[in-house]
Amino acid sequence: MSLADLIRQIPVLEAAGGSTTSLPVSMISSDSRDVLPGALFIAVRGYSADGHRFIKSAVERGAAAVLCEEIPPVLPDASLPYLRVEDARQALALAARQFYGFASDALHVIGVTGTNGKTTTARLITAMLNACGIRTGYIGTNLCTFGEQQIPLDRTTPEAHILHALFRRMLDSGCSVAVMEVSSHALVLQRVYGITFHAAVFTNLSMEHLDFHKTMQEYAGAKRQLFEQLSPQGFAVINSDDPRAEEMVSKINPEKRFCCTLDQTGRVAGDASRRFSAELIDQSIASATIRLCFPDAQQTISTVLPGQYNVMNLLQAAAVGCGMGLGSPVVAAALDALPGVAGRMERIMDRRRKEFVFVDYAHTPDALFKALSTLNALKSPASRLIVVFGCGGNRDRLKRPEMGRIAVENADLVILTSDNPRDEDPEMIIDEIEKGIRVKNHKRITDRAQAIRTAVALLQPGDVLLVAGKGHEQYQETAGEKSFFSDQETLRNALAEENAGEPEKGAVCKGC
């Protein structure tokens, strides 16, 4: 594609250097390290680094043109075109959309946003639609999937040029729908700018990312942007029990709202023909039976996902299915057949043991409280609930003491450990968690593997262990370096060590 075609929809304020008339562009990048000969390098001001500092590096690696907010006073190569725009992030999104042939316009894009539940809800929607014969791709926390393809990602919502490249690959593989998690960072940083969503889902809003957004009002405003990009023909699915629900969809036509409620009322007005509710009929530590109340019928399903919050996740997936034109019996049958979601209340099975061991991604105060409350309600009164968790480095520090308080108030034993300390001292992170702890039912073991092994060694028959924070993640990030780490693998090895044998072969469950 020529540079002239690529920037056709981008207002260029100033140009310097060479001509743009027929210059071919082979790729788009905002990371100078990824630049190959013929690339358009777009200098974006990032959260921790400014792309303008790397223009020279991009040119040295073969960039054919540079798009930026400030043209360098001395051009690294005056034969190349340098184009100044007002907003490089918007330009990146528009250029990527053009470069990849407007693939997002040809897909039904479903966006899922909220503090907790994004991954579970998005993965449930994806699996449900695929089970119903609708070829659907998924983009979310550290992973993109479509068909047999699995592509690792480094964030929940990729940068715009990566995102549109994935849309193109999905479309070329035969997908008609793309389900994606949309983070508040992605909305503020305009990674999804220019994308029209066929459906938008709001799960909930609670304390998180206040290092970035500063206030809850600012955080809510970021989430609301998703609904401002909803197609006029699209629909919104909302957790109407959440206090922020009305705020999210205040500008959406009530006829385009699908309201999901567990308390049978909800906080958002909506027509009964678009109201969904659910009732948890029965649950054990291994499964649950749920009655889904569609506008036109009631359907009963079973699931390996425990807890009221997972009832809402399933209900919202059901509402999306109906919004896509699927009948309630078809939706219910698809949801009933689904396995669990990796790292979301994932049970680690060892049939030689009589304890219950779970891995969950809970890394916010609200998510940790809900996970612990769910397991407390399901365990026997004589059994103990043990939790192993930590807080991420270089992230919201305000939540650390709150998570410490929640843990000790809702578990019999708490083991504080490391969870991606990044550039922070892991001992100092644990110190901050301990500020919220007023009782002494906790230990601190900085080494996460040792913390997990200690927890397993302390288990008695009937006890419940929750290892929280990482979920599906397969790494530990320390001092800027990522190394392989799996809570699941560490737990299986620890259980095998306690059994004085090897991990049991074939010990799996529907949700593993």
Curated annotation (Swiss-Prot):
Its cofactor is Mg(2+). The keyword Cell wall biogenesis/degradation applies. It is found in: Cytoplasm. Keywords: ATP-binding, Cell cycle, Cell division, Cell shape, Cell wall biogenesis/degradation, Cytoplasm, Ligase, Magnesium, Nucleotide-binding, Peptidoglycan synthesis. GO terms for molecular function: ATP binding; magnesium ion binding; UDP-N-acetylmuramoylalanyl-D-glutamate-2,6-diaminopimelate ligase activity. Pathway: Cell wall biogenesis; peptidoglycan biosynthesis. Carboxylation is probably crucial for Mg(2+) binding and, consequently, for the gamma-phosphate positioning of ATP. ATP binds at G114, T115, N116, G117, K118, T119, T120. GO terms for biological process: cell division; cell wall organization; peptidoglycan biosynthetic process; regulation of cell shape. The modification N6-carboxylysine is found at K223. InterPro entries: Mur-like_cat_sf (IPR036565), Mur_ligase_C (IPR004101), Mur_ligase_C_dom_sf (IPR036615), Mur_ligase_cen (IPR013221), Mur_ligase_N (IPR000713), MurE/MurF_N (IPR035911), UDP-N-AcMur-Glu-dNH2Pim_ligase (IPR005761). UDP-N-acetyl-alpha-D-muramoyl-L-alanyl-D-glutamate binds at S32, T156, T157, S183, R191. It is an enzyme of class 6 (ligase). It catalyses: UDP-N-acetyl-alpha-D-muramoyl-L-alanyl-D-glutamate + meso-2,6-diaminopimelate + ATP = UDP-N-acetyl-alpha-D-muramoyl-L-alanyl-gamma-D-glutamyl-meso-2,6-diaminopimelate + ADP + phosphate + H(+). Meso-2,6-diaminopimelate binds at R395, D419, N420, P421, R422, G469, E473. GO terms for cellular component: cytoplasm. Its EC number is 6.3.2.13. A motif (Meso-diaminopimelate recognition motif) lies at residues 419-422. Belongs to the MurCDEF family. MurE subfamily. Catalyzes the addition of meso-diaminopimelic acid to the nucleotide precursor UDP-N-acetylmuramoyl-L-alanyl-D-glutamate (UMAG) in the biosynthesis of bacterial cell-wall peptidoglycan. This is UDP-N-acetylmuramoyl-L-alanyl-D-glutamate--2,6-diaminopimelate ligase. It comes from Chlorobium phaeobacteroides (strain DSM 266 / SMG 266 / 2430). The gene is murE.
